[in-house]
């Protein structure tokens, strides 16, 4: 039989071409993957350009509405994104309104492509808000939220909210929203005024059916900064979020706040309410905790000062810091509506060496609980040069397990109480003596195993603006810990007064360091 050699060669060539095409297709499919580098490329190019302020496309009717009207606009539960997909995660979106008047672009990342999630009025129920559909046709979203069956297997609850500037909030099982985290803070508490970077675009990975985490990318922008972010959200009893950031500076900044946390403190036992209130405490957080690079643990109770106050802690390679809600008994709050006893602590667990810098605490006066008046962040000693990124990684814990956030060997501060200082007279009546008293209860660690007769003492110090007139320690049989009593006099009431204390047994330090600033004019 004659063989047509040309046809054989042609078939072989065709087979080779098909094989090569298949291999190329498989290689391309395998090689395509969205990553933080894609966002970083956008950020780097954006940083080279001058800043362009975002423009609002919001009709006046929505921009001028009151909060009660904004609450009328609810997401249509039947339209949750990924509703029909085999994944435990669902997405819902925030409508623009009030001061949420700048659209953010939201994209979905699949195994093969990136697609923008387009705004539609079908996503929302507008309640009694009358509007012209034509004016909001291409409006865009203000932000988004993530839902997950965190509390019950058959019910999706909100676990993440990303709305406004670079703010986001996360909750775990049995928690309610409290403090917020941010992508970046610039010039907080400086006379020049604070700059608020904003997330202008998001990319959300479509999760696989078996995924128990959600990956989110974000592009941050502001007059003097641009940033690429990767967030990995892990829902659970204590929800966690891994954060990777690459920040580029367009121009010099006075203060760069990395891993910022924002909270609220109105009053508590260390600073009782000036007006009669049935609540013993009203706050999202009651203290700043720091785990320094040298192993020291520091606890700084929060204040609501009459004037702006800033406290700094110089540290090299911090291991962690956070704004905590210590004390979970409902009797410490007594609020059935807002449940401050269920609000999570926020803890920054650093990854890698962060170098030299400061943990900074900013306390801002507030008359009520509607204002976030507490900010904590890390500010590096050395800022990146223009065009070069500041790269940072950390894990954010949203937790009610404060027991895990201090040394198991050392005792921690259970509570700080402030009172008018007094002395007991011969007739047993207490007489105010012009001092201020602080009572600090230390519990846990090795303290709980010590004999009540152990000669525990305190190492206490005070700044130049104060004088300690009493420094005593006694066993507390109720807590099985020790209570420190400090009575102090302020020299100049117009200035704040710094104090520090820790309990010791001989040369052995038994507790974390209690650090406190008595605000001016108190």
From Swiss-Prot:
Record protein name field: Glucans biosynthesis protein G
Span of the signal peptide: 1-33
Name of the gene this protein is made from: opgG
Example of a GO MF term: carbohydrate binding
Keyword Protein biosynthesis (UniProt): no
Record bears the keyword Transmembrane: no
Pathway in which the depicted protein is active: Glycan metabolism; osmoregulated periplasmic glucan (OPG) biosynthesis
Gene3D superfamilies referenced in this protein's UniProt entry, alphabetically: 2.70.98.10, Immunoglobulins
GO biological process, one term: beta-glucan biosynthetic process
Protein family according to the UniProt entry: Belongs to the OpgD/OpgG family.
Subcellular location: Periplasm
Functional note: Involved in the biosynthesis of osmoregulated periplasmic glucans (OPGs). Seems to be required for pathogenicity.
Originating species: Dickeya dadantii (strain 3937) (Erwinia chrysanthemi (strain 3937))
Main localization of the protein described in the UniProt heading: periplasm
GO cellular component terms, A-Z: outer membrane-bounded periplasmic space
Pfam families registered for this protein in UniProt: MdoG (PF04349)
Domain of life: Bacteria
Keyword set, alphabetical order: Periplasm, Signal
């Amino acid at each position: 039989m004659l063989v047509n050699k040309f046809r054989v060669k042609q078939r072989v060539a065709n087979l080779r071409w098909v094989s090569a095409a298949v291999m190329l297709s498989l290689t391309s499919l395998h090689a395509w993957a969205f990553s933080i580098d894609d966002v970083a490329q956008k950020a780097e190019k954006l940083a080279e350009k001058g800043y362009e302020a975002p423009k609002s496309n919001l009709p006046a009717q929505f921009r001028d509405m009151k909060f009660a009207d904004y609450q009328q606009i609810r997401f249509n539960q039947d339209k949750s994104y990924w509703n029909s997909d085999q994944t435990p995660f669902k997405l819902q979106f925030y409508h623009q309104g009030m001061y949420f008047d700048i659209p953010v672009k939201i994209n979905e990342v699949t195994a093969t492509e990136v697609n923008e999630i387009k705004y539609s009025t079908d996503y929302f129920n507008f309640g009694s808000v009358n509007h012209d559909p034509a004016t909001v046709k291409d409006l865009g979203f203000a932000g988004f939220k993530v839902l997950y069956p965190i509390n019950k297997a058959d019910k999706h609850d909100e676990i993440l909210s990303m709305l406004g500037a670079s703010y986001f909030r996360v909750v775990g099982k049995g928690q309610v929203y409290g403090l917020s985290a941010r992508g970046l803070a610039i010039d907080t508490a400086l006379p020049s005024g604070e700059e608020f970077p904003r997330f202008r675009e998001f990319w959300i990975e479509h999760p696989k059916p078996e995924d128990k985490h959600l990956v989110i990318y974000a592009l941050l922008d502001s007059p003097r900064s641009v940033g690429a972010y990767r967030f990995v959200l892990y829902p659970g009893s204590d929800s966690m979020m891994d954060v990777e950031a690459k920040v580029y500076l367009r121009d010099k900044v006075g203060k760069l706040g990395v891993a910022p946390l924002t909270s609220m403190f109105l009053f508590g036992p260390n600073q009782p309410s000036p007006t009669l209130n049935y609540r013993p405490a009203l706050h999202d957080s009651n203290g700043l905790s720091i785990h320094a690079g040298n192993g020291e643990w520091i606890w700084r109770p929060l204040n609501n000062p009459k004037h702006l106050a800033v406290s700094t802690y110089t540290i090299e390679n911090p291991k962690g810091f956070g704004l905590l809600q210590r004390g979970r008994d409902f009797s410490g709050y007594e609020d059935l509506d807002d449940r401050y006893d269920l609000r999570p602590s926020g803890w920054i667990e650093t990854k890698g060496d962060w170098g030299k810098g400061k943990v900074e605490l900013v306390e801002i006066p507030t008359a009520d609980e509607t204002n976030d008046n507490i900010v904590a962040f890390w500010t590096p000693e050395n800022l990146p040069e223009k065009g070069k990124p500041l790269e940072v990684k950390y894990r954010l814990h949203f937790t009610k397990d404060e027991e895990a956030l201090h040394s198991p060997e050392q005792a921690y501060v259970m509570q700080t109480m402030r009172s008018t200082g007094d002395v007991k007279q011969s007739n047993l009546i207490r007489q105010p003596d012009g001092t201020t008293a602080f009572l600090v209860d230390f519990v846990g660690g090795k303290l709980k195993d010590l004999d009540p007769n152990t000669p525990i003492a305190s190492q206490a110090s005070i700044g130049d603006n104060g004088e300690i007139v009493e420094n005593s320690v006694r066993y507390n049989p109720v807590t099985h810990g020790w209570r420190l009593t400090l009575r102090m006099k302020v020299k100049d009431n117009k200035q704040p007064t710094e104090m520090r204390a820790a309990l010791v047994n001989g040369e052995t330090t038994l507790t974390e360091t209690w650090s406190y600033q008595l605000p001016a004019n108190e």
